[in-house]
Amino acid sequence: MSNTPIELKGSSFTLSVVHLHEAEPKVIHQALKDKIAQAPTFLKHAPVVLNVSALEDPVNWSAMHKAVSATGLRVIGVSGCKDAQLKAEIEKMGLPILTEGKEKAPRPAPAPQAPAQNTMPVTKTRLIDTPVRSGQRIYAPQCDLIVTSHVSAGAELIADGNIHVYGMMRGRALAGASGDRETQIFCTNLMAELVSIAGEYWLSDQIPAEFYGKAARLQLVENALTVQPLN
């Protein structure tokens, strides 16, 4: 047992970020209700961050917060806020203003070293050989995830690395959960409820029709989710 009553540890979580493009609370409320109806098991009562960077018109923050909360989503913070008055309103309600991560400055080139022995790098992988059923959640921390069987609707795959599904993919796949934007998702039969790479996601209705039910490869290109045939 620890000698101290609390312990602070760093951690990371996969959160949905709702980018607001409209200052009218009623419009946002209805749009969120429609999205939640498309993927209720994923979005119902989900914690979210509201990004307000695209808002150009003044916003009634109290009404906006109520409109979002009325859908069942739990607002845990706000990002992209540059307006001092809006910041004050948000902080008055007890919500934190979150600063989105910036790209790190490039590290200086390392000093020359003696040639290393010719060894192959080892990449960890979590392998699942059985079907992933509705309600199951599989997480592969700091590695890739490979599923050789079917993934049912309502099941969830999460990996800090890439995700490979060599069966029918009907559930949710979240690659790059720790923020790695170079990760990808590979499916032999893409029928997912949701696909996400480093927080950028599509719901099932956003997957291009020509790739639905087909072998596909998803990745981020210029910070946007893209899909192409899996050759």
Curated annotation (Swiss-Prot):
An annotated GO BP: division septum assembly
Domain of life: Bacteria
Pfam families from the UniProt entry: MinC_C, MinC_N
Keyword rRNA processing listed: no
Gene3D superfamilies attached to this UniProt entry: 2.160.20.70, 3.30.70.260
Coiled coil regions, renumbered to chain: none
Keywords, ordered alphabetically: Cell cycle, Cell division, Septation
Quaternary state and interactors: Interacts with MinD and FtsZ.
NCBIfam families per the UniProt record, alphabetical: minC
Family that this chain belongs to: Belongs to the MinC family.
Known role: Cell division inhibitor that blocks the formation of polar Z ring septums. Rapidly oscillates between the poles of the cell to destabilize FtsZ filaments that have formed before they mature into polar Z rings. Prevents FtsZ polymerization.
Protein name per its UniProtKB record: Septum site-determining protein MinC
Organism: Shigella flexneri
Encoding gene (name): minC
